[in-house]
């Protein structure tokens, strides 16, 4: 009898445990990550939903960020100098970490964030596929982006477009990207809006269609860019485009005989667009084009005797047309117009891509002398520099009542100047402020060659 009672008690205990376990597992969800974010888009409004799993209880929190229109109607902020904003140290980190081989980096900001865009070579630093990446145009090049100040790696970067020439900007609602790829005699620009292909532009001169390598400029929901097609050492064709929600709504070919525009750096100012470009044909000063939202334009060259291109002659007497001395070849650069004055960014060296400085010429937009009142060191002449370009921070991002001017500098390393199998670069950036600043040198700082080069 005792044995029968004991057996029944054990069976009852087993049944009790089984029922209890079934009730518990029935109330539990399947295993989930602790935090899961889902971003949806509803009527151009970002809805960021974050699920937080605490003690098997789910709480749903929503943070809604309404889109805005980046007006671009404000004037540039008054500034007295440039404060350092970012430095990614990509080459230094890439000697050991997984960092993309890149060139042509640039920065662009929305009303929420700033991102670094760059053209990869489909390869990582210190890897065999980095060999031969001195080449500008290949089918492996892609436009990608990452948060500003971070080294561009496969783990923090977002694919944007297949491209060996590119531009990007944000209108307050979505990112517009422009990526050019294809053969030299028939390349096509692919326009994407919010990551979706919305339009294309075919090469119209069949001679290396190319664009800014820096941000496009947005005003009142429209974004504007400049493209070039034709010889790099002679008269070419130049068009300005108005783009709305990723679609070209208007374009105008510039009537610009004896002008040469490449790799324009564009920015909005009081509702209009100003672009300062590269003359690769015959000018050691920089050409400019300014236009309104209807693409009614004016053209000229920066008149200052402080020359902005590279190579260039020593400073002297400028011209409001192309300065032909040392005018062939060139480098992407930028300037900011303030009335008759101009902030000029340029390499320190007159004949190599090294050093960088910012110079304020109070009458340099229209005057031909070489007098200046401010010079701020950015990179020492003993360190490599490279391309440079403008980007702005809108009032919707900064909370200011003006458009903040900023710039980035590419710090090129490797071929053709150094004994490596690769060419890549890191970048630094600065923004204009009306408070204390300091001149110094912020070089790339990587020790070459790498293991792959030995």
From Swiss-Prot:
- InterPro entries assigned: Glyco_hydro_34, Sialidase_Influenza_A/B, Sialidase_sf
What's the further remark here?
A: The influenza A genome consist of 8 RNA segments. Genetic variation of hemagglutinin and/or neuraminidase genes results in the emergence of new influenza strains. The mechanism of variation can be the result of point mutations or the result of genetic reassortment between segments of two different strains.
UniProt GO molecular function:
exo-alpha-sialidase activity; metal ion binding
State the CDD domains in the record: Influenza_NA
Hypervariable stalk region: annotated span? 21-75
Region of interest: Head of neuraminidase: 76-454
| Residues carrying sugar | 43, 48, 53, 73, 131, 220, 371
Q: Name one GO cellular component term.
A: membrane
**Keyword field:** Calcium, Disulfide bond, Glycoprotein, Glycosidase, Host cell membrane, Host membrane, Hydrolase, Membrane, Metal-binding, Signal-anchor, Transmembrane, Transmembrane helix, Virion
SUPFAM superfamilies in the record, alphabetically? Sialidases (SSF50939)
Q: Which cofactor does it need?
A: Ca(2+)
Q: Which reaction does it catalyse?
A: Hydrolysis of alpha-(2->3)-, alpha-(2->6)-, alpha-(2->8)- glycosidic linkages of terminal sialic acid residues in oligosaccharides, glycoproteins, glycolipids, colominic acid and synthetic substrates
Where along this sequence does the record place binding of Ca(2+)? 279, 283, 309
Spans within the Virion surface topological domain: 14-454
Q: Which gene encodes it?
A: NA
> Post-translational modification, briefly?
N-glycosylated.
Transmembrane region(s): 1-13
Biological process according to GO: carbohydrate metabolic process; viral budding from plasma membrane
Name of the protein in its database record: Neuraminidase
Topology relative to the lipid bilayer, per the entry, is: Single-pass type II membrane protein
User: Where does it localize?
Assistant: Virion membrane; Host apical cell membrane
Q: What is the lineage of its organism?
A: Viruses, Riboviria, Orthornavirae, Negarnaviricota, Polyploviricotina
Q: How is its activity regulated?
A: Inhibited by the neuraminidase inhibitors zanamivir (Relenza) and oseltamivir (Tamiflu). These drugs interfere with the release of progeny virus from infected cells and are effective against all influenza strains. Resistance to neuraminidase inhibitors is quite rare.
Species of the source: Influenza A virus (strain A/Teal/China/2978.1/2002 H5N1 genotype W)
Domain note for this entry?
Answer: Intact N-terminus is essential for virion morphogenesis. Possesses two apical sorting signals, one in the ectodomain, which is likely to be a glycan, and the other in the transmembrane domain. The transmembrane domain also plays a role in lipid raft association.
Tell me the disulfide pairings in this chain. Answer: 77-402, 109-114, 169-216, 218-223, 264-277, 266-275, 303-320, 406-431
Q: Which residues bind substrate?
A: 103, 137, 262-263, 278, 353
